């Protein structure tokens, strides 16, 4: 008789661990008695049609359906192999694992009550042949630390944005420094601006209009090349104003103010890039402080006092130093607030006005202290 009920093939490519039966009488396999079949070669080909009928089980009633197997491609469930000592078999328990659930009709037999599937030497117990396909699947790379969610394209765009902002800022500061140098060291120019004060108000009007357009018109400041044209007009007008203010101070005071401003701004920018503290979360406090400083400036117009002006200039320099730290962190993109890479003109404008205000307040402190 064919040994069709020896094992079930339903995704398992491994033969049963039992060796072939030796010749001679075969002891019955409890609780089901198999007809002796000497010299049966193992493993048997699965589900081969057999010319022999399948007898029922002679030993008592069984909770499992009896009778021969129908001839057809119906997979049968595996029989649990209990730890029964057999003649010709190695003594020991043979735990038989449950078969993986596949897209095949399953046997009505109860699942195997025994533990883990059998693992042959040299095989990985975690391999798919010995695992549960219902719980296993392709590895997910979304939660894998080896595949972070950081987009390298975004990083490169952000770095290019920072380089562009500092390039524009460098050009602006170069124009302003050149203008201040001319207004400070050339006596003819210094005398002209002192005699024609009205040019200061004209440049202030041009600066104010350019500042309003670039600050309030988002579409305009992102439209190339008009955004650069407006920024150039603003830089030229503000440079003229700064140079005219510097012409009313001593040359020594102007040089000291330039040096102190350079040191302060460089330190603040480096610190803002390296620190973990988020200065952008303090934007509301800085705006309120700006309103208070504006009221203080109106008070200084009507009360002409040297000490009061030094205090006002000190508070203004401190406030715009904080604004410089905030505007620097807005470029990085890893804080609570950040600027879009398209806003390089607006970012350069913020940094430029911060540095110019720091310079003017420091120049006021030095000039009033020397009087």
From Swiss-Prot:
It is a multi-pass membrane protein. It comes from Homo sapiens (Human). Residues 1-145 are annotated as: Disordered. Belongs to the BI1 family. LFG subfamily. It comes from the Eukaryota. GO terms for molecular function: calcium channel activity; transmembrane transporter binding. One of its GO terms (biological process) is endoplasmic reticulum calcium ion homeostasis. The chain crosses the membrane at residues 165-185, 197-217, 228-248, 253-273, 283-303, 307-327, 346-366. Residues 84-98 have a biased composition (Low complexity). This is Protein lifeguard 1. It holds the Pfam family Bax1-I. Its main location: membrane. Potential apoptotic regulator. Residues 14-49, 102-114 have a biased composition (Pro residues). Keywords: Membrane, Transmembrane, Transmembrane helix. It is found in: Membrane. GO terms for cellular component: endoplasmic reticulum; Golgi apparatus; Golgi membrane; membrane.
């Amino acid at each position: 008789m064919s040994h069709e009920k020896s094992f079930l093939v339903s995704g398992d490519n491994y033969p049963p661990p039992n060796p072939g039966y030796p010749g001679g009488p075969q002891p019955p396999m409890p609780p089901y008695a198999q007809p002796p079949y000497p010299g049966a070669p193992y493993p048997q080909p699965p589900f081969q049609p057999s010319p022999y009928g399948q007898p029922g089980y002679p030993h008592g009633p069984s909770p499992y359906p009896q009778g021969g197997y129908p001839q057809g491609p119906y997979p049968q469930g595996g029989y649990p192999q209990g730890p029964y000592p057999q003649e010709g078999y190695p003594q020991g328990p043979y735990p038989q694992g449950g078969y993986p659930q596949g897209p095949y009709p399953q046997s009505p037999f109860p699942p195997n009550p025994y533990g883990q599937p059998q693992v042959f030497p040299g095989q990985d117990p975690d391999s798919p042949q010995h695992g549960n396909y219902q719980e296993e699947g392709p590895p997910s790379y979304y939660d894998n630390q080896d595949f972070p969610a950081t987009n390298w394209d975004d990083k490169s765009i952000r770095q290019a944005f920072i380089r562009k902002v500092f390039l524009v800022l460098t050009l602006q500061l170069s124009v302003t420094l050149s203008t201040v140098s001319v207004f400070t060291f050339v006596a003819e120019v210094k005398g002209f601006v002192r005699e024609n004060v009205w040019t200061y108000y004209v440049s202030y009007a041009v600066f104010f209009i350019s500042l309003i357009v670039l600050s309030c018109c988002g579409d305009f400041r992102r439209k190339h090349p008009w955004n650069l044209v407006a920024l150039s007009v603003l830089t030229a007008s503000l440079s003229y104003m700064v140079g005219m203010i510097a012409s009313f101070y001593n040359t020594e005071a102007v040089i000291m103010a330039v040096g102190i401003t350079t040191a302060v701004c460089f330190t603040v920018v480096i610190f803002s890039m390296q620190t973990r503290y988020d200065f952008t979360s303090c934007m509301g406090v800085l705006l309120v402080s700006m309103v208070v400083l504006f009221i203080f400036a109106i008070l200084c117009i009507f009360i002409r006092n040297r000490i009061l002006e030094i205090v006002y200039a000190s508070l203004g320099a401190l406030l715009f130093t904080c604004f410089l730290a905030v505007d620097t962190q807005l470029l990085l993109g890893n804080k609570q607030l950040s600027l879009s890479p398209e806003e390089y003109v607006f970012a350069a404008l913020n940094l430029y006005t911060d540095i110019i205000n720091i310079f003017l307040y420091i120049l006021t402190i030095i000039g009033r202290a020397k009087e």
